[in-house]
Regions:
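PLP-dependent amino-acid enzyme catalytic core
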Residues: 1-283, 290
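Hydrophobic alpha-helical segments, chiefly the membrane-spanning helices
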Residues: 292-294
Length: 294
């Protein structure tokens, strides 16, 4: 079977689509954001049972590239990348443990914690960055004149981009707000030989600058408005279901942040539901002020 994904405008009245190899971050017709869309009709030609068996056979194995818990779901994530262009540190497969005492304190009978930060650079951003940098390598192999990949960051994104570009041998540029990045996060791009710019502004100022730089198609944008990263992060949902023996938790609570990871996890559960693999769950974003967003 030949699976394929593409960029699609999130505006239902527009619905324009673009190749994943197009250097594009917003719809050319209506200027809305884009998401990665999959050919679900083609994916449904395999039964839920067949998908489960395939993913079980790949999970945490050493066969390249499927030992990565992200690329082990390649057909549902980014089938457009040839295996030889995949840039991976065998991300995913993170620990899920039963937090009994914490659950008792919260009044929850069966409380589990998944440590998505157990990754090469110390954050879940690696799950998305493996997809983005692999796609860049794929585009370069097809003749795209990409000279570097760039991002604005307060730490985690820049560390992840630096690591994956170092693995791929692709130059990277990171824009960081001065004195607002931890030493642990700062040392990673510097150690990986990335052009690291410390700017006397906040994150929004860095983001404005990197967007201006990335107007040139030879510098590729790695920030979250590039929806390729969502595809890697949605595998958190796939992995949770697999770790729970193909059962869905009643509730999944995710740190809010900019809601990118919440969106990714929701997309993953929806995709598994559409394939007939799971039932629905309740997904909630939790902010530090204890405000819940359903």
């Amino acid at each position: 079977m030949k699976f394929k994904a593409s960029f699609k405008c999130i505006n239902p009245e527009c619905g324009s689509s673009y190749e994943l190899t197009d250097i594009i971050y917003r719809c050319r017709n209506c200027d809305e954001l884009l998401e990665v869309a999959h050919d679900m009709d083609e994916l449904k030609k395999r039964s839920a049972k067949e998908w489960k068996e395939l993913f079980e056979n790949r999970y945490r194995k050493n066969e390249w590239p499927y030992g990565s818990s992200v690329w082990g779901k390649k057909e549902l994530v980014c089938p457009n990348v040839n295996n030889e262009n995949i840039v991976s540190t065998y991300e995913g497969g993170t620990n899920l443990f039963w937090a009994d005492r914490l659950g008792q304190q919260l009044g929850l009978e069966d409380f589990w914690v998944k440590q998505c930060g157990m990754a090469h650079t110390g954050s879940f951003k690696d799950l998305g960055m493996t997809i983005l940098v692999s796609m860049v390598k794929q585009m370069m192999s097809q003749g795209k004149n990409i000279k570097a990949v760039a991002c604005a960051s307060t730490g985690d994104t820049s560390a992840s981009l630096a690591a994956y570009c170092a693995v791929a041998g692709i130059p990277a540029i990171v824009f960081l707000p001065k004195n607002k990045v931890s030493l642990t996060q700062l040392i990673q791009p510097i150690t990986h030989g990335v052009l690291t710019l410390s700017l006397d502004t906040d994150f929004d100022g860095c983001m404005k600058l990197v967007r201006e730089v990335c107007q040139n198609d030879d510098i590729y944008l790695a920030n979250s408005m590039n929806s390729l990263r969502i595809e890697g992060q949605k595998t958190i949902s796939f992995e949770l279901v697999q770790q729970f023996n193909w059962e869905v938790p009643d509730f999944v609570i995710v740190p809010g942040g900019n809601l990118g990871n919440v969106s990714a996890i929701g997309k993953g559960f929806q995709m598994f539901y559409d394939l007939g693999s799971v039932s629905y769950t309740h997904l909630r974003a939790h902010e530090t002020d204890s405000y819940l967003v359903s």
